[in-house]
Amino acid sequence: MINTRILNTLGLLLIFLGFTMLPSSLWSLYYQEYNDLFPILKSSLYTILFGFILYSSKYLNKAQNKTDFTSNDAFTIVTLGWFLSAIFGALPLYLSNYNISFIDCFFESMSGLTTTGATILGGSTISIESLSHGLLFW
């Protein structure tokens, strides 16, 4: 059984990620790109809600001991944290009207979060310059 403190930590990470999506919606508002405003806001809402669900898991098991995290817990948090961040970070691109596959959105999200700088956009599917300012800011 997974430690509820791990879920609690992952929930806090997703809540933070959801709030970091909100400034992108301000760019969409500023440039009046309403088609991409709502996917960004929905993605932020989904991420924050899922984060709260994970965070509230600490109330399910009140009898759990208050020991420190083990190294296995730390590896689990880091691995799942990167994976969940990339999945939820892909939502603004995936929910937009650009018809980008989820795998491509996941790659773009992971590349952006890790500051790799690699991109698959600009090939045969869609050019980077055609994306909205809000999505580019994200």
Tell me the role of every PLM-derived stretch:
Residues 1-138:
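Membrane-proximal intracellular helices of multi-pass ion channels
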